[in-house]
Structures are given as C-alpha cells and as structure tokens.
C-alpha cells in the first residue's frame, strides 16, 4: 500500500528518495554499488538525474562526463526543469499501481528517463544548441526507444508508462 506523502506538510521528495534507496541497498547487496553510484553519493535530485541520464546516454563519441556537465548546466540554469521532474515523479507515484516508491521511476522507468532527457534536449534546442539537441534526441531514441522532437513542449506531472511504441 502506498503512503500518502503528498498531503504531508513536511514531505521532502529528495530525502524520501534517499531513504528508499538506502533501504534498497541494504535489502539487495547486489545492487548496493549501483545505488550508491547513482543516488547515494549525490547531494541533490538534479545531480542524480544528470548522472543517471548521462550514464545511460553517453557513448564512445559523447563523453559521459561532458554530458553530465551539460545536464547539470541545464538543470541549474532553468529551475523549471527540476520542478517538472518532481511533478513527474509524484504523478507516476500517484497514478501507476506498479510504482510504490518514488525512487523506482528515477532508477528504472525508461518512460521517465525519456521525458526528462527530452526536457533537457528542449532546453538545449531553445538555447541555440540545436545540433546537440538533435544528436541527443537520436541517442535517446537508440537507448530508450522513444523519439521526441526537441522543439516539442510538455507540461508537468507526466507519466509515460512503459514508453514502448511511443
């Protein structure tokens, strides 16, 4: 049964994700290193997202570290992206019966990953870095199987379930 965090005045999404991840690392030692690298060593949700997306979308021709820095820049310059990320995580938690923790979409749901990668691609596109946005759109399509034009605009609170055939 899901906890009703959203109606609590002291709810902190980042702290909840860290607590869930700490519990998962303790419960499943085989994933402890992955969970530490991906979530627990970071000090913010933005840093986790930038790291996780750059790890997934980096390639031999797109350095993971350079991509991480680009993602960090987008998230720090345009705080609306971070607000949308949080709204999307909350929407998935509320609407998806298979999601009983906020950390699950962040770690494992390719639909969530595709939407967040698109948000940053859109920022790049809007800020004159269209060639990079197109490159990352293509990379996102290769990795997640989701193809979204970088000029497309989304609202917040999105849930792209499974993202197969989208």
Please identify what each model-predicted range represents:
Residues 1-139:
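Terminal amphipathic alpha-helical/low-complexity segments used for targeting or macromolecular assembly
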Residues 141-166:
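Structural signal for interior beta-strand "rungs" in well-ordered beta-sheet cores
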């Amino acid at each position: 049964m899901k906890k009703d965090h959203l109606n609590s005045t002291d709810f902190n999404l980042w702290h909840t994700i860290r607590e869930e991840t700490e519990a998962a690392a303790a419960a499943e030692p085989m994933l402890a290193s992955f969970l530490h690298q991906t979530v627990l060593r970071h000090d913010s949700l933005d840093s986790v997202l930038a790291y996780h997306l750059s790890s997934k979308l980096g390639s031999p021709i797109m350095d993971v570290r350079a991509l991480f820095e680009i993602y960090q820049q987008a998230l720090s310059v345009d705080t609306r992206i971070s607000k949308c990320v949080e709204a999307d995580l909350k929407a998935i938690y509320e609407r998806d019966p298979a999601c009983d923790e906020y950390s699950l979409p962040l770690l494992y749901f390719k639909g969530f990953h595709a939407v967040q990668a698109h948000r940053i691609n859109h920022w790049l596109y809007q800020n004159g870095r269209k060639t990079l946005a197109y490159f990352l759109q293509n990379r996102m399509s290769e990795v997640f199987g989701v193809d979204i034009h970088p000029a497309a605009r989304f609202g917040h609170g999105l849930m792209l379930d499974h993202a197969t055939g989208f």
